Amino acid sequence: MVSSSTIKSLIEKKGKDLPESVKQELYEKLIKYNEKYKLTKAEVETIIDEVVKEYERALVEPGEAVGTVAAQSIGEPSTQMTLNTFHYAGVAEINVTLGLPRIIEIVDARKNPSTPMMTVYLDEEHRYDREKAEEVARRIEGTTLENLARTTTLDLINMEFIVEIDPERLEKSGLTMEKVLKKLQSSFKSAEFEMEGYTLIVRPKKFEKISDLRRLAEKVKKHRLKGLSGVGKTIVRKEGDEYVIYTEGSNFKQVLKVPGVDPTRTKTNNIHEIAEVLGIEAARNAIIEEIMNTMREQGLEVDIRHIMLVADIMTLDGVVRPIGRHGVVGEKASVLARAAFEITVQHLFEAAERGEVDNLSGVIENVLIGQPVPVGTGMVKLTMKLPLRPQKEKEEV
């Protein structure tokens, strides 16, 4: 049986080119299997050699057109993806965009996803008790007067807006009629409010035409009484031992401040919110995770390195940029590449005005002028030095 210090020294000696994370993982696994199978030094060396060989085989060849390979590897499975919006797996009440529309949404770096949602994990105190989890959900869930109303009526004769509140919904939201009235009175100074049991009557203080009443009624209905802005309904689900809250809508910055929420695990599917709150590295990881999860939902397997390349390019400048005419492609350093993409004359005029120089370092610009592209064997520049003829031969000539 080999000692742990010998294993460590063999890894350092034979696997010097391996990344630290791979070395550490290899060391831990060798220690584990050494205890189980009593490995010899020769066996340990063979295992390390195999790992090094596999690692080198996994590396990208110099000059490989990684962008083209990534585009093909993501594009081909995407043709088999569905074009529909599905219910989120396991949460039938919440609609979430999946499939190809979600992939397009991510790579286009849309500011607002079509179906934003958050997965809110809870802290030690709240995660094992359903009542406590629902209490946190009530703090998060955005509640408007419309959510609490059983019926709403516009009385044009008396110029009143009448709202019948549902007592069950009111109790579930954790509000009371007094609280509702107080919140509305503080927000709408131009209206009078009257309460009769579970009925709320709203009258404008001044009005000139019926449209004023309609406008006031719409504003009162949509007024948020509690919860986070941008968040609609919440659903509490049990996953394993703990309760998790799913939300329709997203307000990542505010949800992390809610008492009872675990800020280290809570997630949103809005990439821009993640970049704003947690930084660009977190946004990069979110892009990778979202695309990989969307692919897996459809039963498609794509090598994560292709997705990582896309995420790297999108977040290269410290902001999340789309892949397209308004982002990565439209901002290429090469004038000819930009001109070849679209709006040719405008790009050429602007570049001439600025005095730009094209170093012909990319593929498109070299294809345009008929040069070998700097990919694969085209990256290598050979110069051949011919042997000099001896002095005697020169004299004979």
From Swiss-Prot:
Q: Which gene encodes it?
A: rpo1C
- Name the Gene3D superfamilies on file: 1.10.150.390
Q: Does the keyword Nucleotidyltransferase apply?
A: yes
Q: Which reaction does it catalyse?
A: RNA(n) + a ribonucleoside 5'-triphosphate = RNA(n+1) + diphosphate
Gene Ontology cellular-component terms for this entry are: cytoplasm; DNA-directed RNA polymerase complex
What protein name is recorded for this chain? DNA-directed RNA polymerase subunit Rpo1C
Q: Which organism is it from?
A: Pyrococcus abyssi (strain GE5 / Orsay)
Q: Which Gene Ontology molecular-function terms are recorded? A: DNA binding; DNA-directed RNA polymerase activity
Q: Write the record's keywords in alphabetical order, separated by commas.
A: Cytoplasm, DNA-binding, DNA-directed RNA polymerase, Nucleotidyltransferase, Transcription, Transferase
| Subcellular locations according to the entry | Cytoplasm
